[in-house]
Amino acid sequence: MTDCAPLIAAKKLGLFKSHGLDVSLHCETGWATIREKMVHGQLDAAHAVAGLILALRLGLQGPAFPVVSPFIFSLQGNAITLSRDLWNRGVRDASALKKLIRSQKDRLFTFGVVSTFSAHYFLMRRWLEQGGINPDTDVRILVFPPSLMAENLGEGLLDGFCAGEPWNSQAVADRTGWCPAVSEDLIPRHPEKVLLVAERFANQHTEELMTLCDVFKASCAFCDAKENRAQLAKWLAESGYFTASANVLSRSLVGPFDNGMGKVREIETFHIFSRYEANTPATQHATWLLQECMHDLLLPASQLPQARAELARAWTRLTSPVTIKSSKRITKPQTMHN
């Protein structure tokens, strides 16, 4: 994902090495893979969607596993992308889509998200609900890895999707999709990616983790500076983690962001890596996550007290990173999901 930029920047800027950290970056195929590798001890930490904190700690849709999240990498960064076929059928917004759905009752329109415990799922549902569409009964929402979204849209397997960049811009570049909305239009400044850490690692290597947070704070500030964005897009394209070109990667980093149907927008707040105190796992972020899970029936009301307590434990760890100058080693990989 484009918003893995702080990890790439930290490596390219030599921040891991200069802070005495030995960090290995690995790219995984999907969020389910990251979850499984965390549970089975194959990962110490990961660049992950915020909702995985709650899913892992409560054992939702899988075994429970204690994790903490001392750092937020980014806010926003996603978009809704629909097929060109829907555009050709007159769809311009969710209200128009509702009319089309009503006129074709023999067809079940299908939309993709990267995880049910992610902002993408919440954003997709909010956009549908804006047009009076019931996400549970009027359409089908399926989970796919982000890197397959544009491809599945082009092959007609999806009518639309919500994903992070560069997959929306890739669909636009392929002339198979267009974007009616971005994160900021639906849920402004929502937490997107977090540093997800196994609790046992956090307890055993607290100083190393505090140093790592300090490194990421510096790399996030670098990524948020407008003058660094072109270089950042180049680094991402050269990293070997992306099939997308530097041109496609730059659309949400440098801009302008092209919606695929002749409308462009500035990208100043498309990705927020450091501004607005983005890196602090604040109480309002946890509250938002709980509210979304309750609204979308991912969390039974009976589990709400436990969920509040688990999030409080997970999001209050190491919120004041400091630099530790002694040499430290992180033996297992920091993982990003492409």
Where are these regions (language model features)?
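Short, glycine-/small- and polar/acidic-enriched structural segments
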Residues: 1-136, 142, 159-171, 176-189
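Short glycine- and hydrophobic/aromatic-rich loop-to-beta-strand nucleating segment
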Residues: 80-81, 194-197, 201-202
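Inter-helical turn/loop segments and adjacent helix faces that build the functional surface
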Residues: 134-139, 203-208
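Functional cores that coordinate and move charged inorganic groups
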Residues: 146-147
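Short gly/pro-enriched beta-turn/loop segments at secondary-structure junctions
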Residues: 189-190, 231
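Secondary-structure end/capping motifs
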Residues: 208-313
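C-terminal non-catalytic accessory extensions
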Residues: 314-338
